[in-house]
C-alpha cells in the first residue's frame, strides 16, 4: 500500500468530495499509473493568495477503489493556464475522513519527513498533481 498527497484547488476539491473521483492531467499519467487499489490519498488544497487569501489545507483522506481509467468527461474545473484540461486519468475513491474544519497544512510542515527544506516547503509540491509520502507522514496527518 502506498500513500499519496494529491494537490488540488478549492473548486476541484468540491468535485472530489461530491463525486468521489480523483483525476490528473495527461502529463501526470505516469504518476497516477503507480496508484493501486487500496492506496490512500490525502487531499491537499493549495493556498490562495491576495485579498482572498486562504492557507493550504488538508481536506480529506480517501481509499482508492478502482484501477486507473481514462474518462474525458468534463467534471473538473480546468486551470486558467490550460482551459481545455479535463483531468482524464482517474481513480474512484471511498471516503475515509473529511476534515471539518480542514487541517492547516503549514502547522504540519515542521513534523513532516518528506518536506526536507522547511523554509522552501512549497518546492516539494510545486509542479505536481500528486506525490508519494511516507507512511509516517500519512499517520501524522490522519491522526491529527
From Swiss-Prot:
<protein>
    <recommendedName>
        <fullName>UPF0310 protein MJECL36</fullName>
    </recommendedName>
</protein>
<keyword id="KW-0614">Plasmid</keyword>
<dbReference type="InterPro" id="IPR002740">
    <property type="entry name" value="EVE_domain"/>
</dbReference>
<comment type="similarity">
    <text>Belongs to the UPF0310 family.</text>
</comment>
<dbReference type="Pfam" id="PF01878">
    <property type="entry name" value="EVE"/>
</dbReference>
<dbReference type="InterPro" id="IPR022996">
    <property type="entry name" value="UPF0310"/>
</dbReference>
<dbReference type="InterPro" id="IPR015947">
    <property type="entry name" value="PUA-like_sf"/>
</dbReference>
